[in-house]
Amino acid sequence: MFNDRYELTDLVLSGQKTQTRVLIKTKDEFLDGEFNWDSAGTMVTFCKNEKEFIDIKSPYFFGEEIAVTQRHKKAGENNTHNTPNTITITDIRFERLQDISDEDCLKEGVKRASLGFYVEGIKVKNWETESHRETASGCLKLFPYPQEAYATLINKMYGKGTWESNPYVWAYDFELVK
């Protein structure tokens, strides 16, 4: 559920990441039409016209408990996160990717530094010319705004141009169950 390349699972297990977005993949011609979503917040119906529609179900539902595991490389005998962990979905929203607020970017795992924002695993290409933050894991790229850091993360995870295409997403708030 979370991308370990950018240490997102670790952020969940430490309580620093409390929100995630899942891209909705369907035929684009339906996404230009009108839509309605059910009161439970688990399904959206897109209507292309009076006769053509498509239902898109949320992969997760309100109150669902989901197991969170670390990649095997990190899960060792001395690892305190080696025990089973779960999160509980506390809110579901349906929105466009670029509708994310600065506050929600931080809930997604973007971190605040004294001179900008960064994401674990997104390193600078040229530390002499780019703003960066030096950490134990290397020189991480600094961004002036949380949305810019999040947009870069999304494009690295899902492919170049994903942020710019502004797809619909399921946005989930969750709590770590101790």
Language model features with spans:
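Secondary-structure transition motif
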Residues: M1-K178
